């Protein structure tokens, strides 16, 4: 969004459908991101021995996802394609707010680029895409970073103190209902619970929260392999339809009043209904 790319063009871009003139001007010539290339077998050495040594002394300081990012070996797939795309779109950090959540591997701290410190947008976004154990960490100023989802899948808590009127949360790894904790739902069970806690905290600060999580039908379309390029088009189309339904339910459409339609009187005697 900070590039000026219209939100209504997101799905057409993924689905190969016509985009608006503005969307074409920004991303019309940019290639689609391909599925990650197969990587060499990962090693067995933990990605962050430093974090593990610290966790051995104070394990309560680390969230499970953060600890897992340190235990898992470094991923071998790189994110250079993502970096190249965003490097072509940004030559500096945008003036409008842009917060990109990552986890610093050395100590497991969450670092929100754009709030805590700055970096090239391409590097920050690439780091936020570096799923632990799958993609290689991204090095920024000598520190290695991975996806901020290791700390929180939605990072809703970072906006708790901003006194916003409304927060819309896209939570593709959540679920609208309780699901069985099997291998296909390994992340959905804790993600749903974590989102509920974060949303409750933000609502307690006076901010309205609307979280869009997939229902059973949408989860069936998504499947369990979130990295499948073959799923992008059907998932994008199904998600657009599903999200539109959620928003319609939250904010029912009211046709605009015609200028020729007189408004009801606001004072004085009301007209009598004939019998």
Describe each model-derived feature in a short phrase.
Residues 1-275:
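Patatin-like phospholipase
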């Amino acid at each position: 969004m900070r590039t000026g790319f219209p939100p209504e063009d997101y799905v057409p871009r993924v689905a190969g459908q016509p985009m608006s003139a503005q969307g074409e001007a920004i991303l019309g010539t940019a290639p689609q991101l391909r599925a990650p290339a197969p990587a060499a077998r990962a090693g067995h050495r933990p990605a962050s021995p430093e974090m593990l040594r610290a966790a051995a002394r104070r394990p309560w300081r680390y969230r499970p996802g953060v600890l897992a990012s340190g235990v898992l070996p470094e991923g071998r797939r790189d994110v250079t394609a993502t970096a190249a795309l965003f490097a072509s779109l940004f030559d500096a950090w945008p003036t409008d707010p842009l917060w990109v959540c990552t986890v610093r591997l050395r100590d497991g701290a969450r670092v929100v680029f754009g709030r805590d410190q700055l970096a090239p947008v391409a590097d920050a976004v690439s780091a936020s895409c570096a799923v632990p154990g799958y993609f290689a960490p991204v090095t920024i100023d000598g520190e290695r970073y991975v996806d901020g989802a290791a700390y929180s899948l939605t990072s809703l808590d970072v906006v708790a103190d901003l006194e916003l009127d409304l927060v819309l949360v896209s939570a593709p790894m959540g679920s609208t209902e309780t699901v069985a904790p099997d291998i296909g739902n390994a992340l959905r069970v804790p993600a749903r619970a974590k989102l509920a806690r974060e949303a409750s905290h933000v609502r307690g600060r006076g901010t309205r929260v609307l979280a869009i999580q997939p229902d059973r039908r949408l989860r069936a379309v998504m499947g369990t392999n979130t990295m499948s390029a073959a799923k992008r088009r059907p998932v994008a189309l199904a998600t657009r339809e599903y999200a539109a339904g959620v928003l319609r339910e939250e904010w029912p459409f009211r046709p605009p009043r015609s200028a020729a339609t007189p408004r009801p009187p606001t004072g004085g005697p009301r007209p009598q209904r004939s019998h």
